[in-house]
Amino acid sequence: MMDVATLLSAVKRKERTDQYVILAALFALDAHITSVTAKQIVETLQLHLGADVPTNVNASLRAYKAYVSPTDKGPPIRWSLMPKGIEHLRSVSGLALSIASDAESYRSDVGIVCALVHPELAAVMKALGGVGAWVEVGDARHAHIYRETNLSIEGGAKLRIVATTATSMGLTAAAIATTQLVLQFRPRLVAMIGIAAGTRSGDKQFGDVLVADPSVDYNSGKVVFEGGIRGFQPDPYPIGLDPRLRTVLQKYGSTHPLFGEIRQRWKSAVPSKPNRLHVGPVGAADQVIDDATLILEIQKNGRKLIGVEMETYGVYRAVYEAPEPKPRVVSFKAVCDFAAEKSDSWQEYAAFMAAEFAVEFVRREWTALWPKSQ
């Protein structure tokens, strides 16, 4: 970390604008890693400038949209220093301003990736306070829109949550969205939240939550001709859950009471049988399946398959190959149909169940996953 005195002394007194001084304080406070309040900025500057601190720092921060971003609507509002702000400081000061700590630290707690704005992201935003609880953050040069909010967990701490959607359905778009999210916000946990097709085994209901462990790209392999017949030799590279995450999830097996609590919040029709959690292999590929025979083909190579969808493997693979500090990753997708038995009537309910369960799981189990992170 570079202190404020060094940043101030790098610029002649008459050339120190209020903007430079405030950005210098943000950098010294590591606001590019952890957001800070205007009060923290003022207190830091008072140590070096005494009574010459810029007036109305909050109003100034609102005017520096290219350089800073609000991460919490407050009160108090918390502010992050954006990459453009650091570049501006470098340009004015001539200092190198190393941000190696940025590559070595988490900057947020949960990064959420959805394939669809409706119904998936809409359900996530509603589960976390509604549209009014979120603010747009991030660099506008990127294709994705990022929204941020906070989640109060058991014990009283607040988590920084960042959510985005892929630009389209499918593995490639999901992998790109996840990679960009991880590189910009460095979350401790990446969660894919949405809807999926379930398999008929295991007495699944609409709204049952599927957690991919592992996620499998079932289209990975080799097409061959044997005896004049085209065949397929699968060569998947399954990616599973972090062992600690898997263990904590096991607490919600069978018909956990949480699912009944969530169902009571839904104001329309629900399935006749209770909803529950299924943890197991989920297949992923860039195709919508509307053919029962294809499900049977996939199950030949994965008899414990619990569902199929189009994005999770891209998310898992992006996290698997992410730089350190590497996040953990999980996918919560609820059953909206049964592949060949297509119906849109349960999509809203499935998105609701996936989002509500994911949020409750994080709220209740965060300290079990990261007991020393707060």
Task: Pin down the residues of each PLM region.
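Short alpha-helical segments that sit at the start of domains
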Residues: 1-32
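Charged low-complexity interaction tracts in eukaryotic proteins
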Residues: 2-11, 50-51, 58-97
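Short acidic, hydrophobic short linear motifs in intrinsically disordered regions
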Residues: 32-45
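Short aromatic/basic micro-patch
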Residues: 35, 79-80, 309
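Intrinsic-disorder/coil detector with helix-boundary
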Residues: 96-373
